[in-house]
Amino acid sequence: MPKTLKISSAELVAQARAQIEEIDAKDAIALVEDPRVQFVDLRDIRERKHSGYIPGSFHCPRGMTEFWVDPESPYFKEIFGEDKKFVFHCAAGWRSALTVATLNSMGFEAAHITDGFADWVKQGGPVEKDD
């Protein structure tokens, strides 16, 4: 028998979206050439390989994000110490909304693509694929 949750995943995402910076896909596409912007792909590596990725994006597994951005963590990645605007995305914008809300609460400023990589593709954003 399924357990009753105190809050649904949809409610968590809605709460996150209410407190973070969202960038729609069209505006995000305009930033792809900006050297001051770093796109961060939270999708599973299999999603990235299957669907392609935003050119120049950095792959950061969702489960490691908080550790990779924290300079005091043994898992810290130097890219997150750069003076850039970080724009996170996933496939539909749900995981990235939750991620950015968590990162903002840690003091790490970031934004996300509202409807994710799916909308990026729909809006004609550039996509790279590895052979």
Regions found by a protein language model. Name each.
Residues 40:
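Active-site flanking residues adjacent to catalytic metal/cofactor-binding acidic residues
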Residues 1-37, 45-85, 94-131:
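Rhodanese-like catalytic fold shared by cysteine-dependent sulfurtransferases
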Residues 89:
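Short, surface-exposed ligand- or partner-binding patches at beta-edge/loop junctions that are enriched
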